[in-house]
From Swiss-Prot:
Residues 53-169 form the FZ domain. Disulfide bonds join 58-121, 68-114, 105-140, 129-166, 133-157, 186-256, 189-258, 203-306. Soluble frizzled-related proteins (sFRPS) function as modulators of Wnt signaling through direct interaction with Wnts. They have a role in regulating cell growth and differentiation in specific cell types. SFRP1 decreases intracellular beta-catenin levels. Has antiproliferative effects on vascular cells, in vitro and in vivo, and can induce, in vivo, an angiogenic response. In vascular cell cycle, delays the G1 phase and entry into the S phase. In kidney development, inhibits tubule formation and bud growth in metanephroi. Inhibits WNT1/WNT4-mediated TCF-dependent transcription. Belongs to the secreted frizzled-related protein (sFRP) family. The gene is Sfrp1. This is Secreted frizzled-related protein 1. The FZ domain is involved in binding with Wnt ligands. It comes from Mus musculus. Highly expressed in kidney and embryonic heart. Also highly expressed in the eye, where it is principally localized to the ciliary body and the lens epithelium. Weaker expression in heart, lung and brain. In the brain, is expressed exclusively in the choroid plexus. It is found in: Secreted. Residues 1-31 form the signal peptide. Transmembrane segments: none annotated. Interacts with WNT8, WNT1, WNT2, WNT4 and FRZD6. Interacts with MYOC. GO terms for molecular function: cysteine-type endopeptidase activity; frizzled binding; heparin binding; identical protein binding; Wnt-protein binding.
Amino acid sequence: MGVGRSARGRGGAASGVLLALAAALLAAGSASEYDYVSFQSDIGSYQSGRFYTKPPQCVDIPVDLRLCHNVGYKKMVLPNLLEHETMAEVKQQASSWVPLLNKNCHMGTQVFLCSLFAPVCLDRPIYPCRWLCEAVRDSCEPVMQFFGFYWPEMLKCDKFPEGDVCIAMTPPNTTEASKPQGTTVCPPCDNELKSEAIIEHLCASEFALRMKIKEVKKENGDKKIVPKKKKPLKLGPIKKKELKRLVLFLKNGADCPCHQLDNLSHNFLIMGRKVKSQYLLTAIHKWDKKNKEFKNFMKRMKNHECPTFQSVFK
């Protein structure tokens, strides 16, 4: 990540000299030396003069802020650049982006998101470059659409600077455009079998079911999944009377592989969300009680409280 002057192109190289963020931090000095009066004034000019009840402060990025705890710097400013004033609010809103980050849809996803959710402590706010936003959006929105989401209004790219100092990426080879790092597998089926990752998917989904699948069909560019048996773990928007005739759809999944569906003899953990009148599959795992990570997930699920973030993608 670097701080530079924005370039209009999306290829990855910002015009002018890219400064290493570490150097910028060293130049800024210790947390106690930040000019918070100037910082507050600048934030106000960027965010329509919103009044904050707390003055800006430099705080540690907590380990449980999973989106940004390993982003490459250790401290962030509150309020952040998305108008979140408390760490609890930051965690709540940022948690919904962790599953997308795990899809590796663009190499700049974490830098872009964390420049807003957990902005680095400098003497004035620095926003991500518009071209970085556009590059991440163009690579990640197709993945988001598998889950029934679109690029949210709060991250609309024309809000960010294109002719001013801004946060940029410095790729290993800046002559090449960033490429999505994901596989051709349907994104909801490309899941890591780790208890933490399954919990994250559970929290990002509206409902969860233990399911035996009767058949899988192609329909209007989607995969249509017809259950044989199902047991609700988390009903969310599903009404009990709808449960009997429930069918699921793997959005845009007609032609991408979902290896879990190659063998329907197993029970599955199915997670999803309702979009309009459809119930979309957002994650699928083989129901395997012999697997250590799956067993750990089942134990944690009983007492785990998920944050609420329904408003994030509006």
